[in-house]
Amino acid sequence: MDVARLYYEKDRTQNEIAGIYGISRPMVSKLLKEAKEEGIVKITIAAPGEAEGPGQGDPWLDRLQDCFGIQGGAVVENGPNDLATNNAVANTALKLLAGLKQDRLGIGWGHIIGDLTARIERNQGPVRIGGHICPLIGNGGVGLKNYHSNELVRVIAEHSEAEPEFIYTPACALSEQELKLTMALENYHKIYQAWERLDVALVNIGNFPSVPDFASEARYGSLLVKQKAVGRILNYFVTEEGWVIRSDTDYAIQIPLELLRRVRYVVGICSANTKPKALAGVLRTGYVNYVVAPKNVVSAAAELNNELHM
């Protein structure tokens, strides 16, 4: 009961609960599963626009819930090619976000979120997915269209009749001093306050290594290789076991994980080329509680989870 309360009511991650009780993360997952089976915890998954949350009643989604403790989402059939699959993922994610009917939305970055943004831009009328929209991370370099957070927010806000909030910083500061100066700016304070009030966060689940590499060598040195990073959520890198890799020289500017944990709906979105290890690793962190992903990625991630616990 205490484990279930910490996870579902206090929004603690499975890794945090494991640390509190001195048990393994798989044991926490097992206890949460038993709580559902015994009726201690009841989770209702409704279609977009119904009840409080979205879901598809898909057996693969059920497997993700059993394996990783997520609350809902959608598993998307693979198309004849990656482009078709990514379009289907973007369309499904839009329906899910609209079905949540929440006010304050935070947007990550990446190619699949860029596809979603382009889908919104092409729509005939407004796509209502939130009343206020802000970026979750600073802006990428020139020429990286899908990693320019303010542009993604601008387009989405314009075509959803939402109020935008922008961040006037790069995705990564060059030094600790520059990071501190950035965090002292009025604009950063406004964005931080927007992060504190979020109802929904849409985050890209990416691979490691990746292109672009997000200045990973400057931020982490050899840590990502030594600690065997497999994936990424926003600009945080994770291991297959679900641990976020930390570095004293990581000066990334993005929503702090302690604020992300408090967001009611954290929707992780995967493209056709997301590696199953990346999805599994990110879900094991406990920060993502809704997922939109292609079926082949989901099925392989579930199998990896079974292999890890054999």
Language model regions located:
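Key DNA-contact positions within bacterial/archaeal DNA-binding proteins
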Residues: 26
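Short, amphipathic alpha-helical "recognition" segments used to contact nucleic acids or chromatin
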Residues: 1-12, 36-39
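Ligand-binding beta-strand-loop-alpha-helix segment within the catalytic cores
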Residues: 58-95, 99-102, 126-209, 216-217, ...
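ATP/nucleoside-binding phosphotransfer catalytic cores, i.e., glycine-rich phosphate-binding loops
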Residues: 6, 30, 243-310
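Short alpha-helical "recognition helix" segments of helix-turn-helix
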Residues: 3, 13-23
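Gly/Ser/Thr-rich loops at beta-strand to alpha-helix junctions
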Residues: 105-115, 141, 207-209, 272-274
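Gly/Ser/Thr-rich active-site loops/lids in small-molecule metabolic enzymes
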Residues: 214-244
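Short Lys/Arg-enriched helix C-cap and helix-to-coil transition segments
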Residues: 39-53
